[in-house]
From Swiss-Prot:
Mg(2+) binds at D103, N227. Residues 1-229 are annotated as: Pyrophosphorylase. One of its GO terms (cellular component) is cytoplasm. HAMAP family: GlmU. Its cofactor is Mg(2+). Its EC number is 2.7.7.23, 2.3.1.157. Residues 251-457 are annotated as: N-acetyltransferase. This is Bifunctional protein GlmU. In the N-terminal section; belongs to the N-acetylglucosamine-1-phosphate uridyltransferase family. In the C-terminal section; belongs to the transferase hexapeptide repeat family. Binds 1 Mg(2+) ion per subunit. The active site is at H362. PANTHER family: BIFUNCTIONAL PROTEIN GLMU, NUCLEOTIDYL TRANSFERASE.
Length: 457
């Protein structure tokens, strides 16, 4: 059986009060529309068409790696009109098409699979996703036959007294036999107060043709649409609970899961402990037995097993197993830190490689450098990598000891097994096995304060 999907993503999203199209706003680190696309893919649906309109260039940019086809809805004339705009995608296809909305990011791949299975096994012409709620005010009601089939969808304003008591509501997500859908679209009109073409009318047209219409009921959170910043926040809360629950089931400890913020594509190994206030973003991988103390942020990075991170920021970097980072360290993009290293408080590292067992304990800046293994950086070391025009490189070999308050003026090389005296400014290569001293000779002027009249009696 051939299955495909259409995702409606052309809405203006006026209530978002944003210059960006609504569907590219993110929930737990991923654009809403990409949540829907990815879950459709996980349900083994290969052919996906995205109906775009306002901000189409931006939507395409955010979905360019999803292997989609696109249909353009130049004017927003309703959900039915959006599907009409995708008729070319359905041309000459036979099978089943599901229709989803790009602003409902909480739909799961399990529900999508269930929708197709229910629709195809029951040989329905159309199937919709519904939900039951305590207060259905404002929603279209699903009215069923005695057999359980869907009889009709009645908008709230059109409900009679009995229909108002129904708490099963329409989600705006459907499955259709492609041939039935295309035939029904031919009879769709905009004879309503808004002058728009509604997809709900296709259900009525299908039913009047004598075809079977079914519905599956799912939890309300799966059909939640996002039309405002408030609803975006509500969707974020639901998604975050799902993400954190998944990691806890897989063996991750959360000291307070309600104040821990993890993006949807993050991977975390078992026996890792995460303290409150941590933010883990993007395509980050954290391996087993790590400890992330409060208020740490990690983005698009790989953290090896047994790493401890305390009150620190790690961006687009790799940290080797057994390393400790922080408190208050800043690891900037393109940094690779080896195994069992120590990156201490108020250390900033940018675009550098740090070898195994190297210690950078405090108050140090390292930029555009290659640092070997078993090195020690004294407090206040600065790699001076910018010459006013471009960044220069520093190379430090294995077993180098860098004394406190040392400036390494790039480009410069410090070879293996070297010592640099505290307070030095190094501008030339330091040979292997040597001690480098580059500071002014101390001069003591006896009686100077007395001569200047500054000596306190």
């Amino acid at each position: 059986m051939y299955n495909c999907a259409i995702i409606l993503a052309a809405g203006k999203g006026k209530r978002m009060k944003s210059s960006m199209p609504k569907v590219v706003h993110k929930v737990c680190g991923k654009e809403m529309v990409n949540h829907v696309i990815d879950n459709v893919r996980k349900a083994n649906i290969k052919d996906v068409n995205l109906v775009i309109g306002k901000g189409s260039k931006t939507v395409k940019e955010h979905t360019k790696d999803r292997n989609l086809t696109y249909s353009m809805q130049e004017e927003q004339l309703g959900t039915g009109h959006a599907v009409i705009c995708a008729e070319e995608f359905l041309k000459d296809k036979k099978g089943t098409v599901a229709i989803f909305t790009g602003d409902a990011p909480l739909i799961t791949n399990e529900t999508i699979q269930q929708l197709f299975e229910f629709h195809n096994s029951g040989k329905y012409a159309a199937t919709l996703i519904s939900s039951t709620v305590q207060d259905p005010t404002g929603y279209g009601r699903i009215i069923r036959e005695a057999s359980g089939e869907v009889k009709k969808i009645v908008e709230h304003k059109d409900c009679n007294e009995e229909e108002l008591k129904v708490n099963e509501i329409n989600s705006g997500m459907y499955c259709f036999d492609i041939e039935v859908l295309l035939n029904s679209l031919k009879n769709l009109n905009n004879d309503n107060s808004q002058g728009e073409y509604y997809l709900t009318d296709v259900i009525e047209i299908t039913k009047k043709s004598g075809d079977k219409v079914g519905a599956i009921v799912v939890p309300y959170e799966e059909i939640m649409g996002v039309n405002s910043r408030v609803q975006l926040s509500e969707a974020e809360i639901v998604m975050r609970k799902r993400i954190n629950h998944k990691h806890m089931v897989n063996g991750v400890t959360f000291i307070d899961c309600e104040s821990t913020y993890i993006d949807v594509d993050v991977e975390i190994g078992n026996d890792t402990i995460i303290y409150p206030g941590c933010v883990i973003q993007g395509n980050t991988t954290i391996k087993e037995e790590c400890t992330l103390y409060s208020n740490s942020r990690i983005c698009n990075s790989v953290i090896g097993s047994g790493v401890i991170v305390e009150n620190s920021v790690i961006l687009e970097s790799h940290v080797g197993e057994g390393t400790t980072v922080g408190p208050f360290a800043y690891i900037r993009p393109e940094t690779k830190i080896g195994k069992s290293a120590r990156i201490g408080d108020f250390v900033e590292i940018k675009k550098s490689t740090i070898g195994d067992n190297t210690k950078v304990s405090h108050l140090t800046y390292i930029g555009d450098a290659e640092v070997g293994s078993k090195c020690n950086f004294g407090c206040g070391t600065v790699v001076v990598n910018y010459d006013g025009q471009k960044k220069q490189k520093t190379i430090i070999g294995n077993n180098a000891f860098i004394g406190c308050n040392t400036n390494l003026i790039s480009p410069v090389k410090v070879n293996n097994n070297t010592y640099i005296a505290a307070g030095s400014t190094i501008t030339k290569e330091v040979p292997e096995g040597s001690l480098a001293i580059a500071r002014s000779k101390q001069i003591n002027k006896e009686g100077w304060l007395d001569k200047k009249g500054l000596l306190k009696k």
